[in-house]
Amino acid sequence: MINIEKKDKIDIVSFSVAKINAMISDEIRDGINKVFDNSNSKVIIDLKGVEYIDSSGFGCFLSVMKTARNSYGILKFANPEPRVTDLLELLHLNTIFQIYSDMDSCLKSFN
């Protein structure tokens, strides 16, 4: 469900599910929060292939953002699908999260 790989000292989190909802949001939150156990972690959440996120999924990401800030980490998002982009904009979460349309630009933003 959740995959974490490291690239140039940046943890990249991806998902093997197309929907992030109440059924799995706690597991996702806990998995991503473990990455922030180390202070100053840099994390990208790769949303490629995620077609839908419900309110509990967005709540999960807001919780992870708080954890990141508390551990002096950085959290960014990459590759949102069009429907997810629409939801992020509708909920004005694009003003809270750093979101990049592709992985390369997201990785470069850390330099």
Predicted regions located by residue number:
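Short beta-strand/loop segment at the start of cytosolic alpha/beta domains
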Residues: M1-V13
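Residues at the C-termini of beta-strands that transition into short coil/loop
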Residues: D8, S16, M103
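Short beta-strands and strand-loop turn motifs
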Residues: V13-S14, D46
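Thr-Gly-centered strand-to-loop micro-motif
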Residues: S14-F15, A22
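Amphipathic alpha-helical interaction surfaces in cytosolic regulatory modules
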Residues: I20-F97
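Acidic phosphotransfer microenvironment of two-component signaling modules
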Residues: P82, D104-S105
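Short acidic-hydrophobic, aromatic-tinged amphipathic segments that line or gate anion-handling sites
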Residues: Q98-D102
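Generic C-terminal helix-cap and adjacent flexible tail
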Residues: S105-N111
